[in-house]
Each structure stands twice: as structure tokens, then as C-alpha cells.
């Protein structure tokens, strides 16, 4: 890994292909220094993509991109990953320079009904968002092409339908995003050999934690080591969890670079040379 100004560059390629900006990384709730989960992905010949859209993400997005220009990819529908989207509905409908076309929205099977209910001004009704979004549902392991990027969703271990995402550009540069998950074989497969693994680490390690919910720093490091990733970026750390302890746990299991992301950081993902 080498450091660039103003971005951190990951890998040893000669051309920057994919950039990911942290719009929010606080786990489970909005934190004092960060919105909940949200990541802006930019690549050549590809419209800007926002992965997850938790509380506060719309405000952070305005510092980095035009909200009317983005398409949205949701890992799952827990509130801290999607409930700033009704604000984007308003932006796309009522901004004086609102876009004429629809944005793409990918997510779990009940995305349309769940977000429509959240956006509706009336209880028991669904806001029909088909005027502003073209909604698609993930299918496990079925690739989706958006611009120059190939995105492969994988079902992971979480109480609700939840997907990790593997994103690859034409050069072979690869990023895996865990979403929310417990430790599972699918997560290791998702991250196998990627250049960058953006992985949740919601708590420090303890046998008392329930299974199939979240990862500890220890488990994030174990998955990174088993998958043979090049660099581990930790995210989704709640305000009540020690970042330093989570980082130390991950480093004890994974001997590659480990970093806990913060809001507004941008990382460049490059294929191993």
C-alpha cells in the first residue's frame, strides 16, 4: 500500500480505476462523527453508485456528488442501511433541477414495499416510487453489470435477507463489501483474493455474541486471512465499540494492511500488479 494526496491508493497499478468514498461508517446508529452506512463508488464509464443509504448519508453525499446523479445498491433493509432513501425520493421529485430520468435501485426482494412504506405520508399505504426509481432485486450469485463494473451479490448470514457485494472493473481490480453478516462460508468466497475488503466489525470478540448477526474484529481478520485479501478496511463500528480494540483484534488474525475507515475518506482500488 502507498499513500497518495488527497486519496489513499491501494494496489500497484498505473491507472486509477475505482474510487470509494466513505459517506458514513457508524455501525447500527448514526455516530457523533459519522452517518450510518453509505459508500460512494466511482469508476470510469460508470454512473456514480451509492452502496447503502443509512441515516445522514444524503447530507454527506452532497459534499461529494450530485444526489440526482447516483444509482443505489442496498445490501439489506435494516434502518441503518436504507432509511435516508426517502429523502432522496424527495430530492429527485422536487429539486428545481430534478432529473428527467429514473435512477436504478438494487436491493432485497421487498425493497419496493419496505421503502415505499417508509416514504408514504400515510400509514398503511405505499409510496409508488416508480416515477423516480427503476427497482431491481438481487439474486444470489447472479452478476449485474452497471457501466464498466460487474457486481456479484452473495447472500450472507444475517437475520434479514442480506447481501454482500463483490465489485470488479475491467482491469480486474476488485472490492468486496461484507454488508452486515456473521461469519459464514459465503463471506469467505465473496472476498476471495480481492484487492480491498470493506468489512463490518461491530463488536469485540466474545462467545456470548449471537451467531449470524455481526462480526467481531477477530472474525473480520479471520475472514480476510482465509480469503487471501490484499487489504482489510474495517467499517460499521458502533459508537459504543472501541475502534482501537477492533483494529487490534483484526491485526492479530490478518497480517496484511488493516485500517478502520472514517467519514469522507476516499480509497483507490487497484488491481495487484
Curated annotation (Swiss-Prot):
MF GO annotations: 3'-tRNA processing endoribonuclease activity
Annotated disulfide bonds: none
InterPro entries per the UniProt record, alphabetical: cyc_nuc_deg_phdiest, Metallo-B-lactamas, RibonucZ/Hydroxyglut_hydro
Cellular component, GO annotation: plasma membrane
Record SUPFAM superfamilies: Metallo-hydrolase/oxidoreductase (SSF56281)
Coiled-coil segments: none
Family: Belongs to the AtsA family.
Further remarks about this protein from its record: Was identified as a high-confidence drug target.
NCBIfam families per record: cyc_nuc_deg_phdiest
This protein's name: Uncharacterized protein Rv1339
Amino acid at each position: 500500500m502507498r499513500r497518495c494526496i488527497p486519496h489513499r491508493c491501494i494496489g500497484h497499478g498505473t491507472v486509477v480505476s475505482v474510487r470509494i468514498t466513505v459517506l458514513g461508517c457508524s455501525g447500527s446508529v448514526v455516530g457523533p462523527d459519522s452517518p450510518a452506512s453509505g459508500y460512494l463508488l466511482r469508476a470510469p464509464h460508470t454512473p456514480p453508485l451509492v452502496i447503502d443509504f443509512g441515516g445522514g448519508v444524503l447530507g454527506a453525499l452532497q459534499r461529494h456528488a450530485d444526489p440526482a446523479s447516483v444509482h443505489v445498491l442496498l445490501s439489506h433493509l435494516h434502518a441503518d442501511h436504507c432509511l435516508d432513501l426517502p429523502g432522496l425520493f424527495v430530492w429527485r421529485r422536487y429539486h428545481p433541477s430534478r432529473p428527467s430520468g429514473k435512477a436504478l435501485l438494487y436491493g432485497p426482494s421487498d425493497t419496493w414495499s419496505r421503502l415505499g412504506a417508509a416514504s408514504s405520508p400515510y400509514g398503511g399505504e405505499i409510496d409508488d416510487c416508480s416515477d423516480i426509481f427503476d427497482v431491481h432485486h438481487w439474486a444470489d450469485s447472479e452478476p449485474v453489470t452497471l457501466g464498466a463494473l460487474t457486481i456479484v451479490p452473495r447472500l450472507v448470514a444475517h437475520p434479514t435477507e442480506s447481501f454482500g457485494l463483490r465489485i470488479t472493473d475491467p482491469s480486474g481490480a476488485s472490492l468486496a463489501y461484507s454488508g452486515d453478516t456473521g461469519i459464514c462460508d459465503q463471506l469467505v468466497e465473496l472476498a476471495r483474493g480481492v484487492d480491498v475488503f470493506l468489512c463490518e466489525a461491530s463488536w469485540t470478540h466474545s462467545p456470548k455474541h449471537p451467531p449470524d448477526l455481526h462480526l467481531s474484529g477477530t472474525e473480520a481478520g479471520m475472514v480476510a486471512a482465509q480469503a487471501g485479501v490484499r487489504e482489510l478496511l474495517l467499517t460499521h463500528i458502533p459508537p459504543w465499540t472501541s475502534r482501537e480494540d477492533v483494529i487490534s483484534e483484526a491485526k492479530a488474525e490478518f497480517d496484511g494492511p488493516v485500517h478502520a475507515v472514517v467519514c469522507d475518506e476516499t480509497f483507490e482500488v487497484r488491481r495487484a500488479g
